[in-house]
Amino acid sequence: MNDVDKTLIKKLAERASELGGRAYFVGGIVRDEVMGRPIKDVDIEVHGISETILETVLKEIGKPIRFGSAFGVYSLAGHNIDIALPRSERKSGAGHRDFDIRIDPFIGIKEAARRRDFTMNALLKDILTGEIADPYGGTEDIKNRIIRHIDDKKFGEDP
């Protein structure tokens, strides 16, 4: 992550906070930091603000590209940063892609993290405070070198 990316990310987090939301690093970036590994990609999840407001904020700090319309996922042109709203997923058919997606910026950390595969990938880190949210015990699993899925049913739906 370069200095320009760090500046954009901080602006996003500050603006989200001003509007009543919170921006978190999620998934692999947090896992890799906890494990002492180099960061490969940057994934951010913004809680507590609507999609319309998020789009406005992204336009203030860069050129947003919406590439996962059903998933509420954006990127900023020229930057390797993915920004998403929290969502839940429910299996709706037999196929690998048969899921009902519900974007909901207000579902909370635990429910948003529930859709992830393993506890170590369900970590969130508040961008402004540095506080790590660990609703499923991922840091302890990393420490103990355990790979544990979060939810039997969801893991069986998309192994």
Question: What do the predicted segments below correspond to?
Answer:
Residues 1-159:
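Catalytic cores of the polymerase beta-like nucleotidyltransferase superfamily
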